[in-house]
Amino acid sequence: MKSAVITFPGSNCDRDMDVALKKFGFKNKMVWHQDFELPKSDLVVLPGGFSYGDYLRCGSMASKSKIMQSVINFANSGGMVMGICNGFQILVETGLVPGVLLRNKYLEFILSLIHI
């Protein structure tokens, strides 16, 4: 299988993801956020980190990166896309994952289990 890991300014663990995917037999390509086209892939991964800084909705800036239209087209055509941590936030900001990211009522970290 072929995969692509998208790297944004502030991404971390993108290289770890590259190593892990290769360990499991993927032929992985690292893709810079300013690229326009994805390489032929079966899986696209948006890793964690702090794209454009450690702020609420920092994924909103990353969602406007040049590569994201190709990621959206890939997902809409049935391609597998995985977002980890900030990568998930980017997917929410693009509209590929429904929902919105908001500050909570108390402006504090809350950890609780939820059932989806």
Set out the residue ranges of the language-model regions.
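N-terminal beta1-alpha1 cap of cysteine-dependent amidohydrolase-like domains
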Residues: M1-I84, L91-P98, L102, E108-L113
